[in-house]
């Protein structure tokens, strides 16, 4: 997500969601069983292929024509699954919001921040979830606290990550590991922070992402009809929520 390729490119949330849907659809078609699927250290991850994918996305942004879109689709079809995951991370890392903060001299400063899930929304939801006795509907309550466009993107990401976690016996991507790989992409990394502050933010974001993922999985398990087959591994993942 933090590659130097097109690092200054920013994506509108609706545009990012459209790319996320296309990329994850292709990953699903290829399968999510590959070991270290979400890892940037995966042996089969190709830097050159990832750069081509990123350039294809940028081309569709700068020249939104049918030809550019077709070229991007061709890149999707021929890329390996690890490069597609790298592209997914890049897309999520390009979502930014401008916020107003006060400096030490009380001067109002406009600051660019990454991540798309507001941290304060998450913490208030977490506190309310505890008061409500950890209802199986808690994920739905989180979605209702978010802007519609944010909720749509979070749903798309969680739907993909839940599939990945369900296949953790093959890809080794447990909910905890998923949280570590995607936490900063959901909540963003602090700007100009010390190592200790950045690491603390990483741990918080990782744990929060794992929490949301398990809440998502638990909600959908509770909504499944009695006759619907659910993988035993999925049931075990949410047993101790």
Model-derived segments and spans:
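Well-ordered alpha/beta subsegment
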Residues: 138-141
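C-terminal regulatory/linker segments that are acidic, Ser/Thr- and Pro-rich
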Residues: 1-11, 15, 19-21, 166-241
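Short amphipathic alpha-helices and their capping/turn residues within compact interaction modules
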Residues: 28, 32, 62, 66, ...
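Amphipathic alpha-helical oligomerization segments
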Residues: 79-82, 132-136, 146-161
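Catalytic and GAP-homology cores of small GTPase regulators
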Residues: 1-131
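Short sequence/structural elements of tandem HEAT/ARM alpha-solenoid repeats
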Residues: 120, 155-156, 173-176
């Amino acid at each position: 997500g933090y590659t130097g390729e097109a690092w200054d490119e920013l994506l509108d949330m609706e545009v990012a969601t459209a790319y996320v849907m296309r990329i994850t659809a292709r990953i699903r078609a290829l399968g999510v069983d590959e070991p270290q699927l979400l890892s940037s250290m995966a042996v089969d991850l190709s830097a050159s292929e990832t750069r081509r994918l990123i350039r294809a996305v940028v081309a569709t942004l700068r020249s939104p024509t049918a030809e550019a879109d077709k070229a991007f689709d061709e890149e999707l079809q021929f890329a390996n699954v690890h490069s597609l995951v790298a592209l997914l991370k890049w897309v999520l890392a390009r979502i930014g919001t401008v916020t107003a903060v006060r400096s030490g001299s009380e001067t109002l400063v406009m600051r660019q921040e990454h991540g798309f899930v507001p941290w304060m929304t998450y913490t208030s939801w977490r506190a309310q979830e505890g008061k409500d006795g950890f209802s199986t509907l808690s994920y739905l309550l989180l979605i209702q606290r978010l802007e519609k466009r944010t909720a749509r993107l979070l749903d798309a990401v969680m739907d993909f990550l839940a599939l990945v976690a369900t296949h953790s016996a093959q890809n080794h991507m447990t909910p905890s590991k998923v949280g570590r790989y995607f936490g900063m992409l959901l909540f963003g990394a602090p700007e100009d922070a010390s190592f200790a502050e950045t690491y603390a933010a990483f741990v918080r974001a990782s744990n929060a992402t794992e929490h949301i993922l398990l809440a998502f999985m638990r909600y959908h398990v509770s909504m499944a009809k009695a006759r619907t087959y659910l993988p035993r591994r999925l049931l075990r993942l949410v047993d101790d929520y």
